Design a protein with these regions (language model features):
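Non-transmembrane, aqueous-exposed alpha-helical and coiled segments at domain scale
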Residues: 30-183, 192-342
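N-terminal secretory signal peptides that target proteins for export/translocation
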Residues: 1-12
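Bacterial N-terminal signal peptides
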Residues: 18-26
């Protein structure tokens, strides 16, 4: 009588099954890519722009996605081929998102601000058309209504990126969205601090910026991406303070401590940074209670004048003992260097 017990699959069968799985995966990937290309092509017509036009910007989270064993890079290829946007041309921008997030692609015509945003929903792609002109998106009413759109808060990620590009701000600023996920007022404050340091305290031969990110908030991602002052290189340490500790700091609006350090001589200079968001709100045309994207966009014109918001509240010498101690867990860096109330 024939034995129906499970038997080990023959090598030929295994190869056939693996090949079948690959064919199904490839077919699905090609199908998704082709559908996206079709939606992009229609979107370009909607916003009245030709592929590879200097008026066209494409923003997407595609490189960071990995869904059902499909890399988001297949979508990047579809975008490049259909829209003609490329990294080298400066009109293809990315922003970080979780690998399981839905695909987002924004097509933006800077001539008049008309935009189509494509969002993946299951196996389908849905699109919405917006007027994202500078005048429109800098009105609080636009953001009051944003929750009624399919995209919701995604607009707060996409709009500042599009407007930064349209205004010609430095490419390095827009790259921050690839680490931070958006261009919020906090990461923009970090950008201003970086520009201030480079302008007022440029590094000498062999020197490094060491960041003591206390208190830590969005700003600190700018130090990591733009200065290379990362935690992995031991050039950034981050910590928070209790409310009681904050009250005792003598630095107004504390934004962390930067050490200009020379590892060869083991000496450096400490800079206690101050960043006042009240000063930021004063330059927002629509008022201090404006939505965050408007606050961010109001700062673009100040990128060459970081000193308007960034100050050095105190300077101090740093020797090797202080350098080691200030980076230890549990140490209040302000107390260590005498910047707290007696």
């Amino acid at each position: 009588m024939e034995d129906f017990r499970m038997k080990q699959a023959r090598p030929g069968n295994r190869i056939f099954l693996l090949g079948l799985v690959f064919i199904i995966w490839a077919w699905n990937s090609i199908g998704h890519s082709a559908e996206l290309s079709s939606v992009i092509d229609q979107g370009l017509k909607t916003i009245d722009v030709q592929p590879a036009s200097p008026q066209l910007l494409v923003v997407t989270n595609a490189p960071y996605l990995h869904q059902q064993d499909v890399s988001g890079l297949i979508y990047v290829r579809a975008i490049e081929k259909t829209a003609g946007a490329t990294v080298g041309s400066g009109n293809l921008l990315f922003f970080w998102s979780d690998s399981s997030s839905p695909l987002l692609v924004m097509l933006f015509n800077k001539e008049h601000g008309k935009s189509v945003v494509i969002k993946q929903r299951g196996d389908d792609f849905h699109s919405e058309t917006f007027d994202l002109s500078w005048e429109k998106v800098n009105q609080p009413q636009f953001w009051d209504e944003a929750g009624t759109y399919l995209l919701g808060r995604d607009l707060s990620v996409l709009v500042p990126l599009a407007q930064a590009w349209a205004k010609g701000v430095p490419y390095e600023y827009m790259k921050l969205a690839e680490l931070h996920g958006d261009l919020c007022p906090g990461i923009t404050a970090g950008y201003l601090m970086v520009k201030y340091l480079e302008k007022e305290y440029p590094l000498g031969n062999g020197e490094q910026y060491i960041i003591v990110a206390t208190p830590s908030y969005c700003k600190d991602d700018a130090f990591q991406l733009l200065l290379g002052s990362t935690a992995g290189k031991k050039r950034l340490v981050a910590s928070q303070l209790s409310e009681e500790q904050k009250k005792n700091i003598t630095v107004p609006h504390p934004a962390g401590i930067v050490i200009v350090w020379n590892p060869s001589t083991r000496t450096g200079k400490g800079l206690a940074l101050s960043f006042n968001f009240d000063d930021v709100r004063e330059v927002v045309p629509t008022g201090k209670d404006s939505p965050k994207p408007i606050i961010t966009m109001s700062l673009f014109k100040w990128f060459n004048q970081p000193e308007r918001f960034v100050k050095v509240a105190a300077k101090f010498a740093v020797d090797n003992t202080v350098y080691k101690k200030i980076r230890e867990t549990g140490v209040n860096p302000y107390e260590l260097v005498g910047l707290t109330k007696k």
